[in-house]
């Protein structure tokens, strides 16, 4: 009898791997990929990276929407549609500030606290505090392949802590530089 680990799919390039990976996962077949991945593009890293951007500057609509819709906060797409219906003009942050009461009041309080922490804590302590207060590390651990996702998030936090020696703005600049230079590459080399 054959086992899953008796088979190997070799591809000429990495570009098509996502299609194969999705098809194999859909069929319930475990997939091992030895690829270099952009950590910043991982679906379980993007919300946390967006949170850092929003703490640094909340007037960024796309990161703010990503944070509001993430497992860190209890909002849905319907909440954002309702908010936009009430405040169709201006930025999303302006709508949250002026049209989102009382539904978004807890978010605004949390964001104010996170921004205060960002001004007073070193980045490594800030990251630990954010993970603890949002429960995001636990949420990521509950995903399929949670152990790998947790490991990725911890790797991202270690990278951000070293990049953020000058504070949160340093982390944001480092993320932007990594994006311009092709991403934050990490060898995932595990179950995917």
Which role fits each region the language model picked out?
Residues 99-102:
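Alpha-helix boundary/N-cap detector
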Residues 83-90:
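Amphipathic, charged-and-aliphatic alpha-helical interface segments
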